[in-house]
Design a protein with these regions (language model features):
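Active-site-proximal alpha-helical segments within enzyme catalytic domains
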Residues: 144-148, 186-209, 266-281
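Active-site SXXK
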Residues: 46-71, 97, 145-149, 197-200
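Active-site Gly/Thr loop motif
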Residues: 223-277
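A short, well-structured edge-of-sheet supersecondary motif
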Residues: 7-41, 268-269, 275-279
Length: 299
């Protein structure tokens, strides 16, 4: 039994012994070795905040295409809202949004608001810290990045990614939730199978390429997984991360591991030094780090 088989077997055993409500696990190696175990029907499910990493990939492609830079002020993309923006909002950059360091303590938008543009709500929210200095996990940051992409491409986030990423990964006709105004939510609401989620990890592990096609630059992937902000604590509704945060991706620099993470046990974990990708879809209630903790022990 090789190392990958041992990790797969150990993870499968731990999931079953702990009685975790896992839908499926997929392991890939760089040699296209693949192991799959499904406990339920192989269908697309909401990967929750693991979707955020696709937002980052979209930003990287926009950078590659010369449509924006990470140092651009997000307010410059919304000239119509400049008169309403709170003081200091002009300091918030694309990079700040990627690192969840906008300086605004707004996590998500109220569900009962349907007649006001979410972008306006974000821009007029007051700053609580200097942009770029303090991590504050925020679905609003991901949403705003999607709106920036719309501004520079003329397409919704989802539509922009279809020919550039989803089709190339074999993720056909993706479904991604929208806000009341019809803009891709970005932060959550993307439905994928466990294997489709794993393809994101293969793209990252290969430095921005998949099946020989370059999708996003290797330089962006390196920055995405190394340019981090300290993120040891999350909101009380989430388990502690014990990691730092790159460009919409969690990073454990000491272990040289990074991952996309959605609540209730959605993971796409990349272990570069093992040439290994592990994806998991689940519904863990209450939410916990049980799956990630198990994987950390096995590797």
């Amino acid at each position: 039994m090789n190392r990958m088989e041992k990790i797969f077997s150990g993870l499968k055993t731990e999931i079953e012994q702990q009685g975790l409500n896992v839908f499926g696990i997929v392991l890939y190696s760089s040699e296209n070795e693949k192991y799959i175990n499904l406990w339920s029907e192989n269908k697309r499910r909401n990967i929750f905040s693991a979707a955020k990493t696709f937002v980052s990939i979209a930003i990287g492609i926009c950078v590659d295409e010369g449509r924006l830079t990470l140092e651009d002020s997000i307010l410059e993309f919304f000239p119509e809202y400049k008169p309403y923006a709170s003081s200091g909002t002009e300091k918030i950059t694309v990079r700040n949004l990627l690192q969840m360091a906008s300086g605004k303590a707004i996590h998500r938008f109220p569900k009962d608001i349907s007649d006001t543009d979410y972008a306006l709500l974000f821009l007029r929210e007051s700053l609580t810290t200097e942009p770029g200095t303090v991590f504050y996990y925020s679905n609003a940051c991901s949403y705003m990045l999607g709106r920036v992409i719309e501004k520079v491409t003329g397409n919704t986030l989802c539509d922009y990614l279809i020919p550039r990423v989803f089709n190339k990964l074999g993720i056909l006709n993706p479904e991604w939730s929208t806000c009341p105004q019809g803009h891709t939510i970005g932060a959550t609401g993307l439905a994928l199978t466990t294997e489709e989620l794993a393809r994101l990890g293969v793209l990252l592990m290969n430095g921005g390429s998949y099946n020989g096609q370059n999708i996003v630059s290797n330089g962006y992937i390196k920055s995405m997984t190394t340019d981090c902000i300290c993120a040891k604590e999350l909101h009380s509704e989430y388990p502690k991360s014990m990691a730092d945060y790159g460009y919409h991706i969690w990073v454990n620099g000491e272990r040289n591991i990074y991952w996309a993470w959605g609540k209730q046990g959605q993971y796409c974990i990349v272990v570069p030094w093992l040439n290994l990708v592990i994806s998991v879809t689940a519904r863990l209630e209450p939410d916990s780090n049980a799956i990630l903790d198990t994987i950390m022990k096995l590797i």
